Amino acid sequence: MEYFKKEVDVAGKKFIVESGKVAKQAGGSCTVRIGETVVLVTVVSLKEPKVGIDFMPLTVDYRERTYAAGKIPGGFFKRETRPRDGEVLVSRLIDRSIRPLFPEYYRNDTQISAVVLSHDGENDSEMAAILGASIALYTSDLPFTTPIASVRIGKINGQLIINPLIAEQKLSDLDLVVSGTEEALTMVEAGARELSEAEMLEALNLAGKTLKGICLFQKTLPAKTKIVVEQPQHNSLLKADIEAEAVSKAEMSVVIKEKCEREFFWDSFKKDISSRLLEKYPEELPSTIDAILEDIFYQKARDLVLNKKIRTDGRGFEEIRPITCETGVLPRVHGSSLFTRGQTQALVTVTLGSPCDMQVIDELIVEYKERFMLHYNFPGFATGEPKRDRAVSRREIGHGNLAKKALKHIMPDGEDFGYAVRIVSDILESNGSSSMASVCGGSLALFNAGVPVKSSCAGVSMGLMKEGGSYVILTDITGMEDHLGDMDFKVAGTRKGITALQMDIKILGLTTEIVAQALEQAKRGRFFILDQMDAVVSAPKNDLSNYAPRMITLTIPQNKIGELIGPGGKNIRKIQEDNNVKIDIEETGRVFISGVESDGVKSAKEYVECLTVEAEVGKIYKSRVTKIMAFGAFAEILPGKEGLIHISQLSNRHTKRVEDVVKEGDEVKVKVIEIDKQGRINLSIKAAL
């Protein structure tokens, strides 16, 4: 592995790339440094291809070592365990960025590892990891001959910013990550605060121009001689025998509108012809016959769309499948909806909780609480397949994150709506675009739950089929169109603009004109879906569900937080137990009181107010005598606040014994006559007469 150390300037920030110093036994490796953030990326691959598979076995792992930020992991074992969701999402970004650049028939098991070794808390490790993956691949002997780069675009005060700092990202109206070669895009992921199509296109154009320079820089790096991947050559006699039967069957299959019926027809034919041909050609593998059959089906399906201008289910290119929307479908949940579009169906629920239900996110740089959560579940029965219910898949994490981005910017501020909100999307049926169904169902369920969201939100998945200079853009693609197409382009948003965007491209040569057309076509589709949703429910319910917790917010002086909590938590524990409520206190003095019963919440609020209110000199209070002493009596005028009634202040007449006037437990009116410098309260009964 040849040593080199070079740097490239990206919008005034230097990326320093070094290779040949560490991890030299890997097929390719490098470190990428920006500021004091350092990422090590390695790539290894088996020398021989896997047999009997029709996909590239690529695994990408992005991990953040806690020592990179000077931290020790929490938990009993004090070491990094399974990847956090954030790490999984970056792994997916890298995978989606580079996968389209591998040869179609490359089948060697390949693993890319990106490890964050140092993080300065300012510079983005994600962009460094994607750049490092490209360099490690490009300088290795793997058949990766076209380098890619990635750039993050933000928008603050109307100005586009290339690779904003982490602090700047929090202020940005746009979080756009774009990967691509010097000529074309390969991956796009974005979350936005209702930006227009024109604004999004402007950001994409800026990203494309920035990528070009980084890709040209990589071409100056020394690279090993590349492995040559040859297209498999099939037995010509076998291929002719298959084509003699399969061409007509494929033409019949691709026009069957129902997914299950089409799959049954084609799978039955495949099983029949495969068994017959394996007897005739015993030296051939079943996977070889499957590959030839799938290629025929692929060509016929694309020919139907590109040349005959007919979609496989008979729809027009911009036609959206039939939509049905229902809300309040589950009786006991806080909010629910059932969104169905064609053969894709999402059951979406909303659960409201108190601030203590917020998710604690322990990231490498910061720890914070997440008020809004969205979880996406994709069981096997959604596609009629058996599937073990194991850990959440990377795909489920990715789809849930996209739907969360789409809905995040319509959520009310925590200042206005203090509840923790959890959305769960259970996919009951799937034939394409289940993540966008989750967005639509999530919006409807939020309305049904009475969450004061800013507007309704919908999403649609777009597809592209391109052959030479000819192409068609499809609205609301099915699973088969996604599989056969050259692009999967998901766009979600409101009537004001885009809130989330995701694009995966399988081909090179995607032009700005195509992207612009796809954005405008997606806008028309989104508006159509919003019309269907608004016809069912156009605004949030005025009231929360009877089963949702009631919440009251109030603010107390910061110096009173200790008094509210009490010694060892005594006061707050008593309030919670007596009123069956939960109380959460922020450092600012903001107090959240939540409970199932409204009366309990109100009672707890009154108690908190009394406990934290200051006694006022000259004010008369109803009090309860708590303790008798020789020199006077102590009385509680407010919860947790006692004052002394000196024996001389018990009555207008001379008092020899305190017990002659008051006894423990008596309720008497008292007046605050003094609060001394130490905060001690002096009371008087005779002054209150």
From Swiss-Prot:
Organism annotation: Endomicrobium trichonymphae
Q: Which UniProt keywords apply?
A: Cytoplasm, Magnesium, Metal-binding, Nucleotidyltransferase, RNA-binding, Transferase
Annotated positions binding Mg(2+): D482, D488
Q: Where in the cell is it found?
A: Cytoplasm
Superkingdom classification of source:
Bacteria
User: Do you know which HAMAP family this protein is assigned to?
Assistant: PNPase
Taking every annotated instance into account, which residue ranges of this chain make up the domain KH? 549-608
Please report the name of this protein according to its UniProt entry: Polyribonucleotide nucleotidyltransferase
Coarse class of the protein's main subcellular location = cytoplasm
Span of domain S1 motif: 618-686
- Do you know which SMART domains this protein is assigned to? KH, S1
Q: Please provide one cellular component term from the Gene Ontology annotations of this protein.
A: cytosol
Q: Which gene encodes it?
A: pnp
Does the keyword Transmembrane helix feature in the UniProt annotation? no
GO molecular function terms listed in the Swiss-Prot or TrEMBL record: 3'-5'-RNA exonuclease activity; magnesium ion binding; polyribonucleotide nucleotidyltransferase activity; RNA binding
| Reactions this protein catalyses | RNA(n+1) + phosphate = RNA(n) + a ribonucleoside 5'-diphosphate
Please name the taxonomic classification of the source.
Answer: Bacteria, Pseudomonadati, Elusimicrobiota, Endomicrobiia, Endomicrobiales
Task: State which Enzyme Commission number(s) the record gives.
Answer: 2.7.7.8
Q: Name one GO biological process term.
A: mRNA catabolic process
